[in-house]
Amino acid sequence: AKKIIIAVNSDLPNLNIKKRFSFPLILTSSITRRLTSNECNLIGNPAPWGVLSVKPTGATVRFTNDHRIMIRNTSNPYFKSLYNFDDCIKKHRDGLSKRFPEIKHVDFDNSWSGMISVSRNGNPLFGNIDRKIFYGGVYNGGGLGLSALFGAAMIDSALAKNNSRLNIVESYPEAN
């Protein structure tokens, strides 16, 4: 290959890239089945809403357009031997019951997990190993927008395209 772009976020340390600068967290979410009209009335018949924590690992609760409740209130350092999916679902159940005791009987329709990567100082990683290998990651839960920005900047860097996007990304303080 002429140039390589490495964008594996939480797996950067597994490739010996900035090995001591980040660690993976696993976040788990659950979503209820659709609430009935009666169940919606019990919780005040709300319009769709969402509450997101200012911290990437904080709780997220949403009431969706199709009358479901989505909750994420778990974040765990990812060690396969210590992660317990069922414990996370129990925490979701407890959170739902505390926030919405009127509908604590409602089952979850689906649950899932995903990885994020975090650094000690909350900053991402971006750079190159040499003139042919470029990397980016550790978005600290910054979401799709931040990862897309860094992905595009990796391409700009690999193609030696100096532009405002690359300047923005290169101005970030580096993770430590």
Stretch-by-stretch model annotation:
Residues 1-38, 42-130:
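Active-site substrate-recognition segment that forms the wall
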Residues 129-176:
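C-terminal lid/capping helical subdomain adjacent to the catalytic/cofactor pocket in oxidative enzymes
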